[in-house]
Amino acid sequence: MEILHDTVYNPAYNMKGQGAPESVVNARPGLDIGAASTWGNAVVDYDKKKLEKAAELLLADYDKLKNSAGYQYDLANVLEQVLSNTAQEYQKKMAAAFRSGDAEEFSTLSDKFLSIIDMVEKVTGTQKEFLVGTWTVSYTHLRAHETRHD
């Protein structure tokens, strides 16, 4: 827990814009990605290796805790952030390869970046809270409720 407090839970590191750093995975493709939204940021000031260590520690207890919904949610959330941090590094390297005209390196890095996106999808797909369908169904129910009370 201390690692999380010193990294992603630390307000000094995760409130630079309108909230926590946004993932480049969610951003419009580009060479210079500052954020996924117009009001956010993609600045990760904490030590990314520390968060990777937290993920390792969570995974080490998988067999003991796999039946805990809270553990599964936290694990998915931490793994998604580790993958997003990794994607950010690859995106920067891809941009550098593109700018230098190194098509082979750009292609290699692009393939790795796309595989990270696939991993993010698999990890977040384990939790209903991360699924788009969950949000659209909630909106539909909320909208129907509002319409009945108008």
Question: Model-derived features: where do they sit?
Answer:
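Conserved, mostly hydrophobic/aromatic
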Residues: 94
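Short helix-adjacent coil turns
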Residues: 100-105
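Conserved small/polar residues in nucleotide/adenosyl-binding loops
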Residues: 140-149
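Amphipathic alpha-helical coiled-coil segments
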Residues: 119-129
